[in-house]
């Protein structure tokens, strides 16, 4: 029987679908954090130089970094990225991290790209809100992005800003740059070894770092190479899964996936929440393979109407 110990639960997957992210505080042990930090410092100049070169920037003026291993090429299977003795590779293969990855994008997803984000102490500038794509296509398949912090980040210390629940809005990359101070947005701070896992569509931004400590973060994007259907530990799926009759205006359930999907961020209140419920239900149908799943009857109502129309046209 396949080992499920490190895979996500159905409850955690439902939280990911609802919020667009998961957070795992102090997940990576300190010796590995220290080794990964040293490797990140060595790799950072080279990664920045290659990025500027690709963008047509002034790459030639950058000092060549120590690069014990080149960055993987896009579409490389994750299992082939950063082989031993790489500390970043050890972090990605750490059992709890591997289980998270497998639950969301499969056992051996494709490497998309990665980058080392270094915000020096006292850095005054941050980023605007953005999505890491030009325009998200239709369909439910998704990439994930891991944000790994090998050192502690104090409040106000340059932690990533992000908007929970924004991932299903299919926004243009820069189309949300004008939004500021969104109600319910979070500013990351936390202990060393913390991992944030984002849906590709989550709105986020780098922050200024007025603190006296440099902030380091490693980000990697992964593409699924298999259908993302029931890849997690489904031992609790039967207990939490609801049928389409779970309807808050009729007979709502209590400990169900639908109940989790009714939980809204502060900016999603009112009728906005209904839109979010429909998007979450559609994504959950993809992940579970259950084409009847629904929250508050919205998708089912459409199917019933379409069926009635089909009968009338016969």
Language model segments and positions:
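Short, solvent-exposed loop/turn segments at secondary-structure junctions
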Residues: 29-30, 117-119, 134, 153-155, ...
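Non-heme Fe(II)/2-oxoglutarate
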Residues: 202, 207-314
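Non-heme Fe(II)-dependent double-stranded beta-helix
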Residues: 1-18, 25-129, 135
């Amino acid at each position: 029987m396949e080992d499920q110990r490190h895979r996500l639960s159905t409850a955690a997957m439902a939280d990911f679908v609802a919020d667009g992210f998961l957070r795992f505080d102090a997940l990576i042990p300190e010796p590995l954090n220290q080794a990964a930090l040293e490797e990140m410092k060595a790799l950072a100049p080279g990664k920045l130089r290659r990025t500027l070169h690709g963008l047509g920037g002034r790459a030639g003026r950058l000092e060549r970094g120590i690069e014990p291993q080149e960055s993987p090429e896009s579409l490389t299977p994750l299992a082939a990225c950063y082989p031993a003795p790489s500390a970043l590779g050890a972090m990605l293969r750490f059992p709890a991290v591997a289980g998270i990855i497998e639950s969301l994008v499969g056992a051996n997803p494709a490497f998309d790209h990665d980058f080392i984000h270094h915000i020096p102490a006292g850095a005054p500038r941050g980023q605007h809100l953005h999505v890491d794509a030009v325009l998200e296509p239709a369909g439910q398949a998704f990439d994930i992005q891991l944000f790994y912090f090998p050192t502690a980040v104090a409040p106000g210390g340059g932690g990533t800003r992000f908007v929970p629940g924004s991932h299903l809005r299919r926004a243009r990359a820069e189309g949300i740059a004008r939004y500021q101070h969104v109600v319910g947005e979070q500013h990351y701070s936390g202990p060393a070894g913390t991992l944030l896992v984002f849906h590709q569509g989550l709105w986020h931004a780098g922050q200024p770092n007025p603190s006296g400590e440099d902030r380091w973060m490693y980000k990697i994007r992964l593409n699924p190479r298999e259908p993302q259907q029931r890849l997690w530990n489904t031992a609790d799926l039967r207990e939490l899964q609801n049928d389409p009759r779970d309807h808050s205006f009729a007979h709502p359930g209590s400990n169900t996936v639908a109940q989790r999907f009714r939980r809204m961020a502060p900016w999603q209140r009112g009728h906005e929440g209904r839109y979010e419920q429909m998007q979450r239900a559609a994504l959950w149908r993809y992940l579970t393979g259950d084409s009847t799943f629904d929250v508050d009857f919205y998708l089912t109502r459409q199917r019933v109407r379409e069926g009635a129309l089909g009968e009338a046209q016969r």
